[in-house]
Amino acid sequence: MKQILKLLSGIALLSIAGCSLGGPPTGSLAAWEKPGADFTEVGKALLECGMPTPYDMDPENQKRSINAKATIYACMIQDGFRDKVGGGTWCENYKSENLPICQPGAVIPRRSVKKRLNSPFCKQHPEQYECYP
């Protein structure tokens, strides 16, 4: 009986903590929403906007500059996605950095299927749904 109680307590704790056992880390995937878009569509959009992989903790993503991150953010907003986390935009939060993407007249890149298919993620994992043409 004690073992069952411990097991149920552990499951409840993991559920409350929001852990997803066996699943990939979500990070940016969970931060974006758009009507009709599932996790796969969010992943595709992130890759098409220039994110190396759809998972924040991947080493390729850690190498990005603040301007690169702000550019991906701007691309996602331009495509109709909403940042669920909030807390201000990259341009607001890094105003003192004078990011190129935040300057008047800066060109915000559009989503690119070519960029997604040539991303480090899709080159390494072509079997993933995000990497289907």
Language-model-detected regions and their locations in the chain:
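Bacterial N-terminal signal peptides that target proteins for export
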Residues: 1-9
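C-terminal motif of bacterial Sec signal peptides marking the signal peptidase cleavage site
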Residues: 15-18
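Mitochondrial intermembrane space
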Residues: 20-133
